[in-house]
Every structure is written in structure tokens, then in C-alpha cells.
Amino acid sequence: MQPEELFIGCHLSAGKGWEAMGKDALSIGATTFAFFTRNPRGGNAKALDEADVAKLRELLEAHHFGPLVAHAPYTMNLCSAKEETRDFARRALTEDLERMEHLPGNYYNFHPGSHVGQGSDVAIEQISDALNDCL
């Protein structure tokens, strides 16, 4: 990517598959796009279809797309006071980062969460620990 290059895109649905996202982006003249790695309200991610991912990678390369932005679910809270919520967040983060290895060189956007009364120091430590464990 050259510093003067500008990539324009939007958030697209992954519901019809990864190659379909690329085709949707092309149909609107986008040169990048963002997508949720799973349902934005949480839950399990769909099984990854490696052939579908390969087709997307070919499309991205052929049309000189810029970096993509994978977006974590909004329910991911790495600093929740509830252990089960933190466990889901760590699992989702780990799974998403593993999935993004199929699209190297792209971005991963997540909201680290809310400390829900535990205080910023506790939250920062929980987020830091989770990132260190997952990376």
C-alpha cells in the first residue's frame, strides 16, 4: 500500500460467505470492507470454509483491495466482572485471531469492554492478561 492510496468501503454481511462479501464490495465500487467475525451479539462463529476463503483471497488480490477490518462481536467483554463473560471473550478473541490467519495482513477491531464497577486498573489488567494469553 502506498501512503497516497485511499481505500473506501463499508460494513458487509458475511452471511452468504467470504467470497460473497468480496463480490458485494466490488458491486458497490469498494476497495476494502469490514465484517463481523460472528453474530455481532455473540455466539459461535460459523465453520470456516477454506475454499471460500481462498476464493476471497484471489478476488482481493486480483482487484487490489486494501486491508480488511474484521470486527469482533459487541458482547465481547474482556474485563467483565463475570468470569463466564470473560471466558466467552477470550474464546472469541482466540478463535477470531486464528480465523484471521487465513487473511493475513488485515485488521481486527474489538471493543475491550466495560469494567462494570471493578475500576479501570482491574479492567486494564484483565484486558492485558487476556491479550497476552490469546496472542
Language model region names:
Residues 78-135:
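Active-site acidic/histidine proton-transfer and metal-coordination neighborhood
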